[in-house]
Swiss-Prot record:
Source organism of the structure: Anthoceros angustus
Domain of life: Eukaryota
Name of this chain's protein: Uncharacterized 3.0 kDa protein in psbT-psbN intergenic region
Lineage, highest ranks first: Eukaryota, Viridiplantae, Streptophyta, Embryophyta, Anthocerotophyta
GO cellular component: chloroplast
Cell location: Plastid, Chloroplast
Keywords noted in UniProt: Chloroplast, Plastid
Amino acid sequence: MLFKKISKFVGWLSGSSVGSITSKTHE
């Protein structure tokens, strides 16, 4: 399913790039 692939990709982004950026912003 395409949606599943997108969810996985978004989750991976949140875990790596977005996650670190958000952490720095929240500090």
